[in-house]
Design a protein with these regions (language model features):
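Short beta-strand scaffold positions
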Residues: 73-74, 146
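Cytochrome P450 catalytic-core helices
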Residues: 78
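General small-molecule cofactor/ligand-binding pocket signal
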Residues: 8, 72, 94-96
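Phosphate-handling substructures
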Residues: 16, 20-41, 45, 87-150
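An N-terminal RHG(E/S)-centered segment typical of histidine phosphatases
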Residues: 1-69, 81-84
């Protein structure tokens, strides 16, 4: 397979998990409920804002009249929803699990303060060397793009 001439990488729209993390970063940890922290990462859905974002980028791509040879998406619900909401004509999406983002392990289910207090060394490493930092009990896969469109 030859290398693409152009590679478009599109991140999923805002997800329910993004809302929880953003609220926590602003000091509101009320969304870190037992129901929320037990949702598997792959199952988070888009919010209404996320669907609007996906629709917006989809309309823009269609307006560019760009045709793609391949359309790839991770198996996560939010990425598949983004792909579907973009409504790209003639797109046949291929699920590819290599495109999934890395797991954040147990850190995904705790607040920022809990992370700082319970894993101080790991917190410091994350802040001094974020490119090579890996969460405790997380996958070793690097961060990959969620949705990919290529042209040749």
């Amino acid at each position: 397979m030859s290398m693409p001439l152009d590679l478009y990488v599109i991140r999923h729209g805002e997800s329910e998990a993004n809302v929880i993390v953003q609220a926590g970063e602003q000091g509101d940890n009320s969304l870190y409920t037992q129901d929320n922290v037990t949702v598997p990462d792959r199952s988070w859905r888009l919010t209404a804002t996320g669907r609007k974002q996906a629709d917006c980028i989809g309309r823009w791509l269609v307006s560019q009249q760009q045709l793609f040879d391949r359309y790839m998406v991770s198996p996560y619900v939010r990425t598949r929803e983004t792909a579907a909401t973009m409504a790209l004509p003639k797109a046949k999406w291929e699920e590819n699990r290599v495109l999934r983002e890395r797991s954040w392990g147990e850190i995904n289910t705790i607040t920022k303060d809990e992370f700082k207090n319970n894993y101080a060394r790991n917190w410091n490493f994350k802040n001094t060397d974020p490119l090579y930092w890996r969460p405790r009990q997380a996958s070793r896969l690097p961060m990959w793009p969620r949705t990919v469109c290529t042209t040749s």
